[in-house]
């Protein structure tokens, strides 16, 4: 009789622990050592294509700065340009919108926000986009989709002190509010 009660107690505890995880939201994290990791965020799958320092005077990088507001175009001696190129896919059966709410956080907790690029003239600029089931951002038939990065650009102006405060973390947030859907560790 004691063995039977013990078995029932073990089964009840096991069932309770399994059920306690139901409904929990798990934040997904990506690692900078593996560009290309798929991250689920808000019913859309995001993938870091490339993240790197950019040079506005380099012929290779010059087109990434098209559509940058003149008020944000200059760097101080203690700033640098940093680009995060993302790809996204809707793997659901319903239309979904990608987010445009991102930030980078360093190990001291300082936040950096992407600069708004004019997507009407910059074919690499990331913008929130509705995706039909199976659709991707960027569209594979666009400049960003066939370009060297395979992703659309989030352009950041960072302090050079970030080299001392690595790794950096890209936070993918809900379109409105501060809820963090997922994070990706970035390195320089």
Over which residues does each language-model region extend?
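Sec-dependent bacterial lipoprotein signal peptides
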Residues: 1-20
